[in-house]
Amino acid sequence: MKTEILNSQNEEDFEKAVSILKNGGILAFPTETVFGIGADMNNESAVRRIYEIKERNFSKPLSLHVASLDVAKPYIKNVPDDAYILEKNYLPGPLMMIFDKTDLVPNYVTANLHKVGIRVPSNDIFQEIANRFDGIIVATSANKSGAFPASSLEQVLKSLDGSIEAVFDNDSVITGLASTVLDLTTRPYRVIRSGFITGEDISELLEKQVLLSDDGDISGTIKQLSKLNIIVVEGTRDNVLNKIKELYEKYSKEHEDKVGVLLADGSEEKTGILKHTKFLGSVNELDHMVESFFACVRAFENEKMDIVIVEGISREDRGWAVMDRICSYASEVISV
């Protein structure tokens, strides 16, 4: 099977996308964070294909991707008033809220859990698909489990070409920074995964305590699909950069110069110009730093590096979400 590329400027291609979903196919589409792959919630064989295509453990649930929270109402229950405050401020956008599910959500979607995640992407292409499709799309990120998420059409095709029916092109900016996942079934509410919207943002908006959790952590899973040893160094800036120089000198000798370094803009003034250095970008542009991380690591893979040493940034404000994302792919995190 050859994966078809759909044109977001072509009206007929949206109808084709809806037809694919109705007939049990798998469709890849952009969101404001990364590309996703989705299927019709009520087609069990199509949903199971998502797991098989991604090589995803069946114990991990999928989420419902909808055009608005209102569409999701028949599928969720015990919805707190706070959900509508969050909807007003953040949706559509990079926030997934977890609710108790109704019996209308099949157990094969939620891995037999009584909860379900609801995501309302703001991307215009997704919104158009969801509004035309008369069912519910269940989805997850468009990549093999444990691999870097896809933030471009080319990355989707590199990973999934031939295993899905179609993928939409995309002209919108995709950050690579994951959506925030907030569990509204617990008291206090719990941030399962940090993203563009921080726990502090949510706590301030709702005027109540919100806990942070590492339940969504996937540390080390990238090692299943990559030979890269990713080491993140975090702490005070001078200590971090001194440690990076130390590690670079050590590992360059041990690995015959197959060591890459990832620094924030300007840090080379402290470390000096180390061979195989790439840059994450400015700490003042955190929204683009995660995507820079993915792009640079992919480049290091192509250059046959063994080790990549990454400069950690401050975890203040949205820096927490950036570090949470980067560290989830690290084989080692060193605090100095």
What are these regions (language model features)?
Residues 1-336:
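Active-site-adjacent structural elements in enzyme catalytic cores
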